[in-house]
Amino acid sequence: MVEADHPGKLFIGGLNRETNEKMLKAVFGKHGPISEVLLIKDRTSKSRGFAFITFENPADAKNAAKDMNGKSLHGKAIKVEQAKKPSFQSGGRRRPPASSRNRSPSGSLRSARGSRGGTRGWLPSHEGHLDDGGYTPDLKMSYSRGLIPVKRGPSSRSGGPPPKKSAPSAVARSNSWMGSQGPMSQRRENYGVPPRRATISSWRNDRMSTRHDGYATNDGNHPSCQETRDYAPPSRGYAYRDNGHSNRDEHSSRGYRNHRSSRETRDYAPPSRGHAYRDYGHSRRDESYSRGYRNRRSSRETREYAPPSRGHGYRDYGHSRRHESYSRGYRNHPSSRETRDYAPPHRDYAYRDYGHSSWDEHSSRGYSYHDGYGEALGRDHSEHLSGSSYRDALQRYGTSHGAPPARGPRMSYGGSTCHAYSNTRDRYGRSWESYSSCGDFHYCDREHVCRKDQRNPPSLGRVLPDPREACGSSSYVASIVDGGESRSEKGDSSRY
């Protein structure tokens, strides 16, 4: 190729736009034979005002440069110089001349590409002295696109126009924005999606475990209440019945907030409704935690046991206190799938054991002591009758009796329990002093005067009658001692 370090190549700048290759060859051919004339054109094939002429003899090129430089051609003074290879193509990197910065690189690149490639790499020997157009930069930029960032970088560092200066600052701003967004996004991650997942997984694990920690609090530890829309009518019924004598938090916790697992309870809402009408008329504020919604560890297995629980509730829970029903087939079983064969014995036992317990006794037993007797309840009720879980709970509250038998000794235990919880009951503004007349209960007043019911203790068969018969046979509901005011209520089958 001729352009590879060819000393006979001249650069002619400042040409008239009307000058073409033939005119250039005719003018410069006087100094010697010309091998190539290259007129740089734009996309529209119009002259850009400069050209390259290659002489066969380098001496002729030198003579032509000396002779033609500064002369007028077609009405314009031209510049003729020795063309040089760009410094970046010969291994080094040089900044383009000052006048070259005002030229558009894209046009020169495309026009050079459209022309012959033989003279593409040549530049004039004297850089920075082109008066009318600065063609050298166009050639430089046409030879290599890679120099465009290099050309732009120094101009921004040396105080170029504001738009060029703003580019690095924009990048810096974007980097700073990204940096600032990083911690914010991390903080969002800490408070957003994962906690929810963690919450879901944690409450699911809670639901299937044997721990009843969540039951001890009143602040809604049960995050899954969104599936309870099918159970709103039963809970509405509870609120109607139970809020008559309950404190402020009873209604808010009922059926909406305090469910451990409510998505499987739609089959059990009617049994719990029956319980609510009979049992919780005088219950206290947290009583509704046990209403068929919250107090089931796993209610998907209690399908067969809800009706026995209903009948049992009319007999046994009719006059129990506020957390008494937590142990009745719903709440006190960490896994109710074990209660399949033991529901009637458990019914009898819960009836006898919780008959005279008060608010704190039930809350401790219903919440924290489920681990002890809940599983024993599912495994063996004879062992449960003589187990120590109830004994520990009762002794902790001032009772000195052991596990309750089915008959006589239970009465003294109940009496002492009534006496032990008089202060706790007074905190809530009312006491629960009398109990069911189903046969095995006795009722105590605040002075812990306990007397046994006149009837003989019924057998297991009599303790567990038909649900409607049981509902009608309970006569004593409660004798509430509240600042000297007492009221009693008769339970009949019309509440069923």
Swiss-Prot record:
Q: Where is the composition biased (Low complexity)?
A: 97-114, 149-159
Q: Which domain of life is it from?
A: Eukaryota
Q: What is its main location?
A: nucleus
Any one cellular-component term (Gene Ontology): spliceosomal complex
Sorted UniProt keywords: Activator, mRNA processing, mRNA splicing, Nucleus, RNA-binding
Q: Fill in the misc note.
A: The RBMY1 proteins are encoded by repeated regions of the Y chromosome, mostly within the AZFb region. The exact number of functional copies is unclear and may vary between individuals, and some of them may represent pseudogenes. The proteins are very similar, which makes the characterization of each protein difficult. Thus, most experiments do not discriminate between the different members. One can therefore suppose that reported interactions with a RBMY1 protein involve all the proteins.
Q: What is the name listed in the Swiss-Prot or TrEMBL entry for this protein?
A: RNA-binding motif protein, Y chromosome, family 1 member A1
Which segments constitute the RRM domain? 8-85
State whether it acts alone or in a complex, and with which partners, per the record: Interacts with splicing factor proteins SFRS3/SRP20, TRA2B/SFRS10, KHDRBS1/SAM68 and KHDRBS3.
Residue ranges with Polar residues bias: 175-184
Per the entry, what this protein does is: RNA-binding protein involved in pre-mRNA splicing. Required for sperm development. Acts additively with TRA2B to promote exon 7 inclusion of the survival motor neuron SMN. Binds non-specifically to mRNAs.
Q: Where in the cell is it found?
A: Nucleus
Residue ranges for the region (Disordered) are 78-349, 452-496
Determine if RNA-binding is one of this entry's keywords: yes
One BP annotation, GO: positive regulation of mRNA splicing, via spliceosome
Could you confirm whether the keyword RNA-binding appears in this record? Answer: yes
Output compositional bias ranges, type Basic and acidic residues: 204-214, 242-253, 276-289, 313-326, 335-349, 484-496
Source organism per entry reads: Homo sapiens (Human)
Q: Which InterPro entries match?
A: Nucleotide-bd_a/b_plait_sf, RBD_domain_sf, RBM, RBM1CTR, RRM_dom
Expression sites by tissue: Testis-specific.
Task: Write one Gene Ontology MF term.
Answer: mRNA binding
